[in-house]
Amino acid sequence: MNQGRIIVITGSPGTGKTTIASIVAKESNMDKSVHMHTDDFFHYLSKGAIPPHLPESNEQNLVVIEAFLEAAKRYARGGYDVIVDGIVGPWFLEPWRALVREDYEVHYIVLRASKEETMKRAVERSKLDRKTNVELVETMWEQFCNLRIYESNVIETTTY
């Protein structure tokens, strides 16, 4: 059995992650694929959950990401192309680099739309209050700008 790839599709909210990840999973050249939403792993938390954007959530977020990584590895070992759909900034790539050192094939793709388009797409669909959502989306959009060595991983999605 061939080991599957792990393809991380990331970017700020409103850049098309879920749409693109779904297409990539369905069009994979592997016999099997899985579309994994990182957000789902945060929704599994029932008691004592801390909103992941708050600074005090760091320990919780590490546990959630570790659980997610283990699931992704297991699918890949099972021969699935693993399409990761979530916010994985360069500031949090070390766990993914560790997978490469474990001989997993990992790809990192950043989707980016203009700030105006990103805000238009993301702000209205959030479950957070508008002010908090605007602040979060603006912050995340800025975090995915000027990616230095990862700029070559960016795909522009403003017109898609």
Predicted regions and their residues:
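Glycine-rich phosphate-binding loop used to anchor ATP phosphates in small-molecule kinases
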Residues: E59-D103
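Phosphate-binding P-loop
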Residues: M1-G4
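Conserved substrate/cofactor phosphate-moiety recognition/catalytic segment
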Residues: S22-A67
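Small-molecule kinase domains that catalyze NTP-dependent phosphoryl transfer to phosphate-bearing small molecules
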Residues: E124-Y160
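The conserved Walker
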Residues: P13
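Hydrophobic anchor at the beta1->P-loop junction of P-loop NTPases
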Residues: I9
